Amino acid sequence: MPSLVNKFNVEDLSIINGVLETANSIFKRFRFVYKSDELYAQLKYCLEEFQKPMLELFQMLTGMVDKCVNDKAALTQLFNGLRIMSRVFYSLNWQTIPEFFEDNIKQWMAQFQKFLTYTNPLLVDADEEDEAGPIETLQAAIIDNLALYADKYEEEFQPFLPEMTQNIWSILTATGQQAKYDTLSATGMKFLTSIVSKKWHEAMFQQDGILKNICEEIVIPNLTLRESDTDLFEDDPVEYIRRDIEGSDSDTRRRAAVDLVKGMCINFQGGVTDIMKEYIGQMLQQYEADPAANWLAKDASITLVLALAVQGSTKAHGATSTSDLVDVMDFLGTQIIPELGNAGPDDMPLLKATSVKFLSTFRQMLEPAHIQELMPGLVKLLEAESYVLHTYVASCVERLLILREKDDQTQLKCGPDFLSSNGLVEPLLTGLFAILGRPDYPENEYVMRAIMRVTNVAGPHIAPLCEVLLGQCTRILEKVCANPSNPSFNHYLFETIAALVKNIITADPSTASKFEEMLFPPFQSVLQMDVGEFTPYVFQIMAMLLELRPAGTGASDGYKAMFPILLTAGLWEQRGNVPPLARLVHAFLQASGDAVEGADLENLLGVFQKLNASKLNEEHGFDLLCAIFANLTVEKFSPYLGTIFELNMMRISGGKTLKYLKGFITSLSVLIGSHGADVASTAMETVQPGVFMMILDQLWTTHSSEIAQIASESVRKNLGVGTIRLFVDMAPQLLAGDQAQQALFGKIVEASVLFLEGSSVEDTGAADVVAGEEALAVAEAAGTYSAAYSKLHYAGQPPRDYFAGVADAKAQLAQSLSEVSGTTPVGAVLQGTLSEASMGKLGEYIAAAGVQIQ
């Protein structure tokens, strides 16, 4: 740091500016981070070395500006240095106001004041439209500093606030509409927003005419779209959308003007609303007088209503709270709905796009009758040539289809019957796929998401279009395989296929084979081409197809031929493949476990060994183990049991975790529940004599309560049923043994109670409609799709119930215990072992089952 400061003494401005750039890049680290002792120590060092020399340098360069008033080249370098120092000022003051800066605040504010009012025609390029000049960039940096002080250091800044506010106001009213002034204008409006929104400064804006002047001189001019904005709408629609509805417009004039309106409404809502309603009325009158010439006025009026009415919003739900002073539904009925149906889809597309945005923003206020009225017009607008317009329409339709009834969040406002009775399914899908068929921008993620939503919401009503829709999707899949460049688009594509599979096969399981015929060729292409982004999706849908096949039909020949390939080590090396691949193998074992033997079984156990060695993937290893135990005969897997248990015990002895114990005890429960305790105990005794009893005493029963708290309902059932079979099979040995063995019997019974009671952890694979839609909406809003692995919400994995024949596990526990007690009384053992709570629950089971315990 001292070496940097020493270079301030050179006369070469380019060297000084280079040093300042270096310092700026170093000091940026102090912005937007949480304070810590280490951070403050670093900041203290930087301040001690830099703060005084920087003030002196700023003052020196300011003096040089006055001397070089006619030297453009020198002025340009000087202003660049002053701008960089202003950014450094921001960094050094972001965490807290340093003592030196507080002591010298008058000197700093004097310098800033000078440049807020500085003019020099030499630094103004009248022919430049887009790139900001030296004065504008410096002023924007200074205003950022003033906004920081106004926001965080109000008391220290208060003496300078009125004059600074007046200067910034003057800049905003004098600045032209050219793009080169955009950053300066937006920054100035942000400053005003931070001031007007605070109660502390309320008196400044209570003078007659102040609010009206802000609205008239600052808000309205900056809210109205310019030629450059309409050019962007036509020439770079993707960027227009990114700014307008994806939240990247934080530095635009319109966004800053909207935020200024919202800021004024915090303390002056009534007055600002009344003022703005006047302007809205004037703008609408201008439009009605000559729509073709004044459509921008109506566009601005819609944006003003949005600014006034929306008080809270989220990307996933639109407006969540609105102003009582703005009649949104009246404006919707008188201005928005007529506009959407006015003339053809290509007439004034930007105004229509803004109208669709309004509709989408306030979608939570709409009832099914409103949507029924709107849908035909929206379907027509899908034909629009404008990329922005048909994209906004697709997004709006998609959002309307996930609206839920306020009184019953499980019910969609526009569900399957709504789409079917209004004849909307085919027109919507036809219009949406037509957009994707256009040569420009073929991978429109908003359109693909709308297709996904229509497909899912339509439910069984999608059946007549099934083959056509699936054909469209597979053709798109073939195209994107060549260059998977848009993760969101690709995710929605596979979600669409998953929704189609789910809806059709759930209604008619016999259609599973037809889906396999249509999907296997493109899926095989994905696997052969090794499209890493898509293989996890393919495996999920293939697993889903198997899981939805009619019971007892087994896997098709295509799956059987593919099964050995699924066990190839290379596939399991890719992290994103592991969860869906494990699910697919599990589904195959469930459907056709009898077909697995020999080399395939050995390779499968090799996969288990690999997964078991990984903390990240161990749960998938146990899934495979459970599938083997539940679906293969003992004769097939018993030769390998000793090795399997040895691997388990090595992991446990190396440092057991509750998660690993849950998987281990669950797999043992499935083994014992399916084949009996003797199979497990015999194999374990070959590993180490006495280890089975040790596991029962020190792992199974000791940790049963903890395991129950982290297990889902289906897993707890598997644990409970397996543990019931365990105490039944072990009863003769344990009840005939010593006091410790009898107590172990009681602890096993208590473990079964704890498993069946447990806590209500949700099944991760449960196909819950509301949860699935909400999770998908959150993922979309956050943009959290991963190229490595993204779970398909519409391909939800069903809960794993290895004991489907046991309808009531609690009744089974009571009946099993009654049978055991018929041979050997257990009442005294249970009374002496079980906790009061467990005895109470057990009593409830016994009473409900109508049995007796001796």
In which residue ranges do the predicted regions lie?
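Karyopherin-beta/Importin-beta family HEAT-repeat alpha-solenoid scaffold
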Residues: 1-854
